[in-house]
């Protein structure tokens, strides 16, 4: 089935079960006639026994039609809605006393301009979970608290990061936090699998290192790069190795400053519109290398579109010290 989605201030989109399409009115030089019960040529050929003249009644006509073009689902609003009331844990007074908006799957389907499959996939990507029938995002400090419980248990039990037992985690940590939250954090930061009838998790090293980097950077405007790398490596669980490529789309290194610095720049905080996204990036930095800018524009690529094609359209290429760099095609205010 097809459904048109969009609020009064939004450009309507058409959604199937798994795809989203922009809708635009297109003109046609041929008049389109609306005929109830009209048969196609194929249907008429199939009924050759009766060759009668058909007197058709025209119910209406049009000189334009809706043209559909596959587009990216508009999912930024999903995170924005869920971040109105992030889940801070079962003991949070805010959760018990205040009545913030909470959203079911049906609510999100009516508010987000995307297909059902695209919305459900994005909920997985942003690590949302269902609590009492409502979709929630964990407040970051609470998320890190849960992750810390798990990594400390892994360390104290000397478990392999590739084989963390669910049952033991729930038994050991169930007195500290709800078991649903412990399992959710394992699902968010690990891959679930079964071995000899027992459920285990293989922890994602890159994702854990990335979360700890975000925690370290969130309260600093800029961080000395070498100092940050030292503190970051000391902060991750034993056996994990930190690398700057784990921070793509999360943090940006300023190699032009002395000493070199790093600061938080999350791709999800940037505008969803292509031109606005490029304007924001060129306000932050006048010239970008392709390596630096790619994590911040990759999600803008439409079906079969490349990062190179986006850069050709929205940026101007030049060479600086033998390195190809990109700056804005238009003046940035």
Task: Describe each PLM feature range.
Residues 207, 227, 273, 277, ...:
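Acidic, Ser/Thr-rich intrinsically disordered and amphipathic helical segments
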Residues 1-233:
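Long Lys/Arg-rich low-complexity intrinsically disordered regions in nucleic-acid-associated proteins
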Residues 282-333:
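C-terminal interaction modules of eukaryotic adaptor/scaffold proteins
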Residues 4-10, 253-258, 317-322:
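Short, ordered beta-strand-loop transition motifs
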Residues 194, 210-215, 260, 275-280, ...:
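Short interface patches used for recognition in eukaryotic signaling and trafficking proteins
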Residues 13-15, 22, 67, 263, ...:
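Beta-strand cores of modular interaction/reader domains in eukaryotic scaffold and signaling proteins
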Residues 220-265, 289-290:
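Noncatalytic alpha-helical scaffolds and linker/capping helices
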Residues 255-287:
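Low-complexity, intrinsically disordered regions in eukaryotic regulatory proteins
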């Amino acid at each position: 089935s097809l459904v048109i989605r969009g609020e009064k201030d939004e450009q309507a989109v058409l959604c199937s079960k798994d795809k989203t399409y922009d809708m635009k009115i297109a003109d046609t030089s041929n008049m389109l006639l609306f005929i109830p019960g009209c048969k196609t040529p194929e249907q008429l050929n199939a009924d050759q026994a009766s060759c009668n003249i058909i007197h058709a009644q025209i119910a209406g006509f049009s000189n334009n039609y809706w043209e559909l073009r596959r587009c990216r689902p508009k999912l930024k609003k999903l995170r924005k809605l869920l971040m109105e009331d992030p889940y801070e844990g079962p003991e949070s007074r805010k959760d018990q006393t205040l009545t913030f908006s909470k959203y079911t799957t049906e609510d999100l389907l009516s508010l987000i301009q995307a297909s059902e499959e695209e919305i459900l996939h994005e909920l997985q990507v942003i690590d949302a979970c269902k609590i009492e029938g409502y979709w929630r995002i964990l407040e970051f400090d609470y998320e890190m608290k849960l992750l810390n419980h798990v990594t400390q248990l892994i360390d104290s039990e000397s478990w392999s990061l590739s084989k963390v037992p669910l049952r033991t985690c729930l038994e050991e940590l169930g007195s500290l936090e709800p078991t649903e939250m412990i399992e959710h954090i394992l699902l968010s930061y690990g891959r679930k699998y079964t071995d000899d009838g027992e459920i285990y998790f293989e922890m994602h090293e890159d994702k854990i290192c990335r979360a700890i980097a975000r925690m370290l950077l969130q309260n600093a405007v800029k961080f000395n790069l070498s100092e940050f790398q030292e503190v970051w490596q000391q902060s991750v669980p034993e056996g994990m190795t930190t690398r700057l490529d784990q921070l793509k789309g999360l943090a940006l290194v300023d190699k032009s400053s002395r000493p070199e610095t790093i600061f938080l720049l999350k791709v999800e905080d940037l505008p969803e519109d292509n031109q606005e996204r490029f304007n924001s990036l060129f306000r932050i930095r006048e010239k970008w290398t392709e390596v630096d800018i790619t994590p911040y524009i990759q999600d803008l690529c439409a079906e079969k579109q490349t990062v190179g094609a986006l850069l050709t359209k929205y940026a101007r290429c030049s060479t600086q010290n033998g390195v190809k760099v990109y700056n804005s095609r238009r003046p940035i205010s």
